[in-house]
């Protein structure tokens, strides 16, 4: 298996996971080392034609991977270092990748951030992905990276109580102090990139929250979030991301 990515977000060219969409719309994730490509050819020039909105959404998928991996409760210092470096690269270059699509330096660093996020998330992800996997099964087909961008601010706020030092390490990359300021910085980044301000803009209303929370509790990423969320916690995070 040879993988040649044409976006910079998922990082599946170095990952051992796959997603199957079931007949009822649910997304089933599974892992196998047999899924890891033998060779990954990561050429940033293949992303030059990616439209700005898709560049932004896939780029924020990479950001979410790096943040959630870094905050995950599993102990893996090498993975943390890779994720942290990937986040630094993404934040330095995502704006330019969106505004200057043929800027090779920006595209190269976003492709690296994407790959690094996936290399590191073998450690585990968290509540952002528990929710986005559940939301991704909706008939309207919301984009995974866009969902992650919208959900990330409230999830980092929720997780601060469990891992305050790690949340501050992420906040340091954004140049702010504390989870509240970090959440605001992520929202500001989403705004600059032209992404939705909340779930409502994506057609996702409060009537869906309870069912989404139920599915999030069953997701494989739920167990590796640094602070275990209850059904009510998930509903609250969705409401705060509206």
Region roles according to the model:
Residues 63-67, 110-117, 131, 152, ...:
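Short alpha-helical scaffolding segments that buttress acidic/His motifs in well-ordered protein cores
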Residues 1-77, 166-169:
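A glycine/threonine-rich phosphate-anchoring loop and its flanking beta-alpha core
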Residues 9, 115-145, 219-224:
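Glycine-rich phosphate/pyrophosphate-binding beta-alpha loops
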Residues 138-141, 145-208:
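Gly/Pro-rich interdomain helix-loop hinge
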Residues 68-122, 133-137:
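Glycine-rich phosphate/diphosphate-binding loops and the adjacent beta-loop-alpha structural elements
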Residues 205-242:
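Short, amphipathic C-terminal "tail helix"
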